[in-house]
Amino acid sequence: VNPIPKKVSVVSTGVANVASVLAAFRRLGVEPQEISRPEQVEQAEWLVLPGVGAFAAAMRAIEERALAGALRARIEAARPTLAICLGLQLLASSSEESPGVSGLGIWSEQIVRLSAERVPQLGWNRVVASANSRFLETGYAYYANSFCLQTEPAGWTASWTDHEGKLVAAVEQDAVLACQFHPELSGPWGERLLANWLGGGRC
């Protein structure tokens, strides 16, 4: 993968370990910066919203830092944004994990608990890329999730995976990409995905 000189900003709210995300971009020749203020979200050239842990704690951290409005405005304007794992789930209206807690509401869909016997989904699983995907190719990605998005939001392009039932692996619209899996932990395949996102599409 060719190094791509871009300014990448990673949202750091204290509830997600961003070290592996930062390291993944450094491997691409990009020096990312951690940010935590709304004006930084607005000004970011390329923005990453990582997420690990509980839906409610992540939304509380976002709201305490007054980031929700800036994140919504950025995504609705289709500015380059990558949401990872819980980051994807935060774009929904709500989650079964945290009843009564609102998400960012980019989509009307609710995040639901995996119906599989094996929960969480932990490890490698196949991603079947949409033929219309700008960023993904079919391959294997690393997952760590107990909740998921099961339906494709209107106006978005979904790629899929199967964990004792079909679920959304990633959704994209213009320069916005949200992945349930961890591209930063998905080896060369994940590295290509990050490079594709930075480059505006598959090479």
Task: Identify the residue ranges that each predicted region occupies.
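N-terminal beta1-alpha1 ligand-phosphate binding loop
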Residues: V8-V30, P183-E184
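Short glycine-/small-residue-rich Rossmann-like dinucleotide-binding loops
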Residues: V15, G51-G53
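Structural signature of beta-strand start/N-cap positions in the alpha/beta core
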Residues: E31, W46, P80-L82, Y140
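Short acidic low-complexity segments
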Residues: P32-Q43
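Short acidic/histidine-rich motifs immediately flanking catalytic phosphotransfer sites
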Residues: V41-G51
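Cysteine-nucleophile active-site neighborhood
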Residues: G53-L122
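Pocket-forming structural segment of enzyme catalytic cores
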Residues: S93-G165
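A glycine-centered loop/beta-turn motif at secondary-structure junctions
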Residues: E152-P153, D162-R202
